[in-house]
């Protein structure tokens, strides 16, 4: 195993890390799907109420959407948002959320022990999504409802008119259909916390019939089968195998989720956890091959990674620690830090490194709850450090992912061995620019990164280097100090055709190489 080298400066011994990356034009993985750059919106805590939607706020438009929050969301260039859940979906009656607001019922939302007013519903989310230029991935309830209700929802959303549900939508002021193409068939059905938990076989049979019926209403839709809530679930992979075996030819994606946390305060181990995400993807890929062969099918499934993030309240029971049956109480509002930005950056790198399998990715969630966008009710809004990692990923991560050769020093942590200090992936953007995303996992040592290009025509020079770090791994941003942790420009050099950049300890980096004209 390669370890850090030692050099002397002014008589003092210091550790020095050097990592090398070779990028060859001919070693390509796959083109990134546009749906890798998505988010997730759920009526949980203050994600919607007091987050995206706050009538009476100084920045709110005529529909109650906070324009200051939209100004933070638009730069993310989200292609799609999953809605409305999430655990919320398991008792969701979609009909409650449409029509005149004064006639919508208030419901006990048992997943998060709150009252759902249904003031912000299906059509409000359609309006909001149009404002930020994103599509909607709709989730239907197969936990406590069934095939007919799922069909009705597709009819309401996607048919032009001439039927009961499509005409009802038109009467609600939406003449044109929403035309949603992607539909999740419930959520985390394997979880014991879920209302309507089921076995893989029983759920798979129901999902198969629901998908078949929904596609009879609109043959253009794609459906997402609910898979494992986490790679740590005792039911994984049996639940996934049984569900896919029952539904394989009728569905198009398998939904999987993964959150990582630092509950034990062990940052080196925390930064290695995306290795579990990588292994999870590869295990799912193996299951795909097995079920396809078992069913003698020509049909393929792909991964919909439609919930992922870092999440430090994941082991708590926050919903039960607060008074029940409130309206949009603050829930799961983690204080995200610089170390979370590096950990999330590695998760995003892992998604890109598996983009031949992963075709949908929705970071959870978009505002306040498990989110990097924070608001104060009646006041301002600001972003937390991981926001920038996703911003850069969405802005520069589109194109063809290349397969690099990486030589990096490694370390061992509590749960992992041979963890590379350098986590990185290159993407060739459509304009020819090569973007390298890189995380230095070392908490104490700078890393000299040497990048060699092979097989590319012309000379490439560093066009831009964005870096983000902070001496304190727990540093964050607040309303009073919104730029405490934020990106800055770095300087990279070319030596004998090899790019050299010094990456700060615990840093997120975006290095962009452009061919000289």
Predicted regions: what is each one?
Residues 10-239, 244-253, 277-278, 282-316, ...:
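Non-catalytic accessory regions flanking glycosidase/transglycosidase catalytic cores in CAZymes
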Residues 257-272:
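Active-site His/acidic residue clusters
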């Amino acid at each position: 195993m390669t370890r850090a080298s030692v050099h002397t400066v002014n008589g003092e011994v210091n550790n020095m890390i050097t990592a090398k990356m070779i990028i060859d034009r001919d070693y390509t993985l796959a083109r990134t799907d546009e749906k890798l750059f998505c988010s997730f919106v759920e009526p949980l805590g203050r994600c919607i109420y007091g987050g995206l939607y706050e009538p009476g706020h100084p920045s709110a438009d005529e529909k109650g959407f906070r324009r200051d929050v939209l100004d933070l969301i638009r730069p993310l260039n989200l292609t799609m948002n999953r809605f409305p859940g999430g655990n919320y979906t398991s008792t969701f009656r979609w009909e409650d959320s449409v029509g005149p607001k004064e006639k919508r019922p208030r419901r006990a939302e048992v997943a998060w022990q709150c009252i759902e007013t249904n003031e912000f519903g299906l059509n409000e989310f359609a309006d909001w999504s149009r404002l930020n230029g994103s599509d909607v991935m709709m989730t239907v309830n197969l936990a406590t409802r069934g095939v007919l209700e799922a069909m009705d929802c597709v009819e309401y959303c996607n048919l032009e008119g001439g039927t009961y549900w499509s005409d009802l939508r038109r009467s609600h002021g939406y003449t044109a259909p929403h035309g949603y193409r992607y539909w999740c068939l419930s959520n985390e059905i394997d979880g014991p916390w879920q209302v309507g938990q089921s076995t893989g076989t029983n759920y798979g049979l129901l999902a198969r019939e629901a998908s078949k019926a929904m596609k009879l209403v609109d043959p253009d839709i794609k459906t997402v089968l609910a898979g494992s809530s986490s790679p740590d679930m005792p039911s994984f992979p049996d639940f996934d195998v049984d569900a896919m075996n029952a539904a394989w030819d009728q569905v198009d994606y398998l939904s999987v989720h993964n959150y990582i946390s630092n509950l034990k305060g062990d940052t080196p181990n925390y930064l290695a956890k995306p290795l579990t995400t990588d292994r999870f993807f590869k295990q799912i890929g193996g299951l795909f091959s097995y079920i396809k062969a078992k069913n003698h099918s020509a049909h393929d499934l792909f991964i919909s990674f439609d919930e992922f993030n870092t999440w430090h309240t994941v082991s708590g029971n926050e919903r039960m620690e607060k008074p029940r049956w409130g309206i949009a109480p603050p829930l799961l509002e983690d204080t995200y830090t610089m170390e979370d930005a590096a950990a999330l950056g590695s998760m995003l790198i892992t998604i890109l490194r598996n983009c031949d399998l992963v075709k949908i990715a929705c970071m959870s969630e978009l505002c306040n709850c498990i989110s990097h966008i924070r608001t104060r009710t009646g006041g301002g809004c600001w972003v937390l450090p991981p926001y920038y990692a996703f911003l850069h990923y969405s802005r520069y991560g589109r194109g063809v992912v290349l397969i690099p050769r990486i030589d990096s020093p490694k370390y061992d942590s509590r749960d992992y061995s041979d963890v590379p200090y350098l986590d990185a992936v290159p993407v060739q953007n459509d304009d020819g620019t090569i973007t390298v995303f890189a995380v230095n996992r070392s908490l104490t040592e700078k890393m000299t990164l040497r990048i060699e290009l092979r097989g590319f025509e012309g000379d490439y020079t560093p066009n831009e280097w964005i870096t983000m770090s902070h001496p304190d791994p727990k540093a964050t941003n607040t309303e009073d100090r919104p730029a405490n942790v934020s990106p800055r420009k770095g300087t990279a050099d070319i030596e004998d055709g090899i790019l050299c950049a010094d990456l700060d300890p615990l840093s997120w980096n975006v290095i962009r190489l452009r061919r000289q004209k």
